[in-house]
Curated annotation (Swiss-Prot):
Mutagenesis / variant outcome for changing K292E: In allele B*73:01
Effect after changing Y91M: In allele B*57:01 and allele B*58:01; requires 2 nucleotide substitutions
Result when mutating D54G: In allele B*18:01
Gene3D superfamilies named among the record's database cross-references: Immunoglobulins, MHC class I-like antigen recognition-like
Residues bearing carbohydrate: N110
Region named Connecting peptide: 299-309
Superkingdom per UniProt: Eukaryota
Effect noted on mutating D201E: In allele B*13:02, allele B*14:01, allele B*15:01, allele B*18:01, allele B*27:01, allele B*27:05, allele B*35:01, allele B*37:01, allele B*38:01, allele B*39:02, allele B*40:02, allele B*44:02, allele B*45:01, allele B*46:01, allele B*47:01, allele B*49:01, allele B*50:01, allele B*51:01, allele B*52:01, allele B*53:01, allele B*54:01, allele B*55:01, allele B*56:01, allele B*57:01, allele B*58:01, allele B*59:01, allele B*67:01, allele B*73:01, allele B*78:01 and allele B*82:01
Effect of W171L: In allele B*40:01, allele B*48:01 and allele B*81:01
Effect on the protein of changing L119I: In allele B*35:01, allele B*37:01, allele B*44:02, allele B*53:01, allele B*57:01 and allele B*58:01
Name used for this protein in its record: HLA class I histocompatibility antigen, B alpha chain
Effect on the protein of changing R86G: In allele B*57:01 and allele B*58:01
Length: 362
């Protein structure tokens, strides 16, 4: 069954963080933990990354030459040595907890010691414009499949299978949900509000997308129109194609929003159109950085390959970012969350990072 690692006691924030500030829209904080076993090649690798909204701000990698939590955003660098020391110790303890969990999970599923397995967890909270909690998250996955998750009421668990029910019974007996709820309703919100205040110049910004439409002949009879949105923040954006004013959702190829490597995002949407009918199609772009939605058409005279080169370079940067992060969403299905930044949140509670009190261990 699962065993509980000792919960790390976190310093509470000062009363100066009383609910006085307000922010535009909702905001989120997420921590993603990933542990990957590698039989015959040493201890499992443990990686943690933290996000506020769509911005990664901290990272820890047990494979680093000197494993330590590192800043990934300028506004977090102002935290003092105690912050980094405390979080580093939390992550090292969590790495050990996850090692035990991986061993037990292998037993739950009757798996051999030869294969590599992945344990992922995500936790965090969403706050509204008034800085109050909208929703908390605490979820786990094993080998890319849901394992157990804290329900929206923050009082009960949902187990994905019979193995996870072992964990569920253990946590219910230990009243683990109460501890998670206390963190999510308290410290998680307080730390998120602190980060929003310290990083407001970056986190509250709204960089509008740079947009254009490109034309790619397929044959004598068809061509692809691709609508590009580049360099925008935050990540939430809407791209739609219309033909004579009617939405072409079913016929649109839409890629997921992807990081550009410079703390902004990219996205495109494409439709295949009959040659000669390109001007009947319009691309519509909505983003909070735009004073009003944009409507674009392909302009034959302005066709250029330069933006495409920029995209290719950006995607190359993206590949490096993704490989380096090995974040929790590698094999976990993303769960939808209310608020910016998506979700798949875990019980590590310190952001300082809270150490997950749970190890999936017997």
């Amino acid at each position: 069954m699962l065993v509980m690692a000792p919960r790390t006691v976190l310093l509470l924030l000062s009363a100066a963080l009383a609910l006085t500030e307000t922010w535009a829209g909702s905001h989120s904080m997420r921590y993603f933990y990933t542990s990957v076993s590698r039989p015959g090649r040493g201890e499992p690798r443990f990686i943690s990354v933290g996000y506020v909204d769509d911005t990664q701000f901290v990272r820890f990698d047990s494979d680093a030459a000197s494993p330590r939590e590192e800043p990934r955003a300028p506004w977090i660098e102002q935290e003092g040595p105690e912050y980094w020391d405390r979080n580093t110790q939390i992550y090292k303890a969590q790495a050990q907890t996850d090692r035990e969990s991986l061993r037990n999970l292998r037993g739950y599923y009757n798996q051999s010691e030869a294969g590599s397995h992945t344990l992922q967890s995500m936790y965090g909270c969403d706050v509204g414009p008034d800085g109050r909690l909208l929703r908390g998250h605490d979820q786990y996955a094993y080998d890319g499949k849901d394992y157990i998750a804290l329900n929206e009421d923050l009082r009960s668990w949902t187990a994905a299978d019979t193995a996870a029910q072992i964990t569920q019974r253990k946590w219910e007996a230990a009243r683990e949900a109460e501890q998670r709820r206390a963190y999510l309703e308290g410290e998680c919100v307080e730390w998120l509000r602190r980060y929003l205040e310290n990083g407001k110049d970056k986190l509250e910004r709204a960089d509008p997308p740079k947009t254009h439409v490109t034309h790619h002949p397929i044959s004598d009879h068809e061509a692809t129109l691709r609508c590009w949105a580049l360099g925008f923040y935050p990540a939430e954006i809407t791209l739609t194609w219309q033909r004579d004013g009617e939405d072409q959702t079913q016929d649109t190829e839409l890629v997921e929003t992807r990081p550009a490597g410079d703390r902004t995002f990219q996205k495109w949407a494409a439709v295949v159109v009959p040659s000669g009918e390109e001007q009947r199609y319009t691309c519509h772009v909505q983003h909070e950085g735009l004073p009003k939605p944009l409507t674009l058409r392909w302009e034959p005279s302005s066709q250029s390959t330069v933006p495409i080169v920029g995209i290719v370079a950006g995607l190359a940067v993206l590949a490096v970012v993704v490989i380096g992060a090995v974040v929790a969403a590698v094999m976990c299905r993303r769960k939808s969350s209310g608020g910016k930044g998506g979700s798949y949140s875990q019980a590590a509670c310190s952001d300082s990072a809270q150490g997950s009190d749970v190890s999936l261990t017997a």
